[in-house]
């Protein structure tokens, strides 16, 4: 069987090349925005998609902000653990990684509760409907500059919904495999003798109890857990890069609003209409909204 180190090298090579291709493609896409005039209409004319529904509540914004900060911490600490560029920092980075992991897991649990069980449950906003599937080709044609506008049926189009839906199982997989790699004892278990040592670790529970038995070897289970965790880490880097790019270039006001910076968007819109000689700011109606 191929060794873990050798496999990690191949994963690094494949995803580094893939990431480079994606960055070049996004640069080309932005050039297309400039050549077609979309960038000027948006960032100069401040014409952006109009969203159906009310403003985004404070709770999802807070959870989104916490998630972003924790995911950045996970990415940086995870890459350092894989590529330690200075000596002596691995222990600190592991703790940063574990703390950020706990925040992401807790945040995901609360967000799922909010989506399905809270008074303001919003899971329907992310559900892919029959109309979404029908309009999906038009959305894709818009993104590749074949169509000048895209259908926008609600707060999110079908591609956005698909991305958010994919994030949930990926986060769950990353949480399980991350806990399987956890070798520090769970708090308050230091007095328990488990698998021949003091304290219960995530690796003991996930790899030692069931994954190892399922695969016939705890070493093999740990090997799979580490490999899957690393691949999903790269998938998050790729998907998040695309997500951030499209958030900024396709709906910058919503991007600002999610981080509590909507006052910048309002200032830009007011300045734009003052330049046009309007005394009032009408509701935004984008030329990209079909």
Where are these regions (language model features)?
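Membrane-embedded alpha-helical bundles that constitute the cytochrome b-like, heme-associated redox core
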Residues: 1-290
């Amino acid at each position: 069987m191929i060794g873990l180190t050798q496999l990690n090298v191949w994963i690094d090579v494949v995803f580094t090349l893939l990431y480079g291709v994606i960055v070049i493609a996004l640069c080309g896409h932005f050039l297309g925005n400039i050549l077609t005039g979309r960038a000027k209409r948006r960032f100069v004319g401040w014409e952006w998609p109009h969203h159906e529904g009310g403003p985004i509540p404070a709770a999802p914004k807070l959870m989104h902000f916490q998630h972003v900060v924790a995911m950045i911490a996970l990415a940086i600490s995870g890459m350092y653990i894989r590529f330690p560029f200075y000596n002596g920092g691995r222990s600190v980075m592991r703790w940063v990684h574990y703390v950020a992991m706990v925040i992401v897991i807790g945040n995901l649990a609360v967000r799922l509760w909010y989506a399905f069980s809270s008074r303001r449950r919003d899971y329907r906003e992310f559900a892919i409907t029959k109309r979404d599937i029908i309009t999906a080709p038009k959305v894709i044609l818009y993104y590749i500059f074949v169509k000048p506008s895209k259908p926008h049926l609600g707060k999110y189009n079908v591609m956005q919904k698909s991305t958010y839906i994919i994030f949930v199982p990926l986060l769950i997989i990353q949480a399980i495999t991350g806990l399987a790699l956890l070798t520090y004892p769970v708090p308050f278990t230091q007095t328990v003798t488990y698998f021949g040592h003091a304290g219960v670790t995530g690796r003991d529970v996930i790899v030692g109890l069931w994954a190892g038995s399922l695969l016939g070897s705890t070493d093999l289970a740990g090997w799979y857990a580490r490999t899957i965790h690393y691949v999903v880490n790269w998938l998050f880097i790729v998907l998040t890069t695309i997500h951030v790019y499209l958030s900024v270039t396709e709906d910058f006001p919503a991007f600002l609003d999610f981080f509590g910076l909507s006052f910048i968007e309002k200032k830009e819109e007011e300045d734009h209409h003052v330049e046009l000689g309007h005394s009032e700011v009408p509701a935004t109606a984008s030329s990209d909204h079909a």
